[in-house]
Amino acid sequence: RSDIIVSILPDTKNTKNFVNSNFLKKMKKSSLLINIGRGPAVNEVDLIKHIKNNPSFFASLDVFNREPLIKKHKFWSNKNITITPHVAAITDHDSSIGYLYKRFMDFKKNKKIKSDVDIKLGY
């Protein structure tokens, strides 16, 4: 039983809602679901219910059934869900170090962090 499950499933008729209530029930109550594949692989309604019933369960989502994620979607207000703006890709470590360092220094100086998720814009 894994602490972390990463979904990289494509969007096919066989993978639609693959991660549903039945799948989630089999996971540890204190685990993390990461979806970087395609949004329709995760049943969003089932995920919300599962998190509500299992407060130690978390999800990190880069893809959704509908993109961009609508402003009133329940994911935005759920503290157990981390949303990333559909940026999963191969990382160039040399360039990412400078990128992260700059943002960290801005954070330390209480400056606005550039390129963060803007809930008002929906991404």
Which stretches of residues belong to each language-model region?
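Rossmann-like adenosine-cofactor binding region
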Residues: 1-74
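C-terminal helix-to-coil terminal segments
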Residues: 67-123
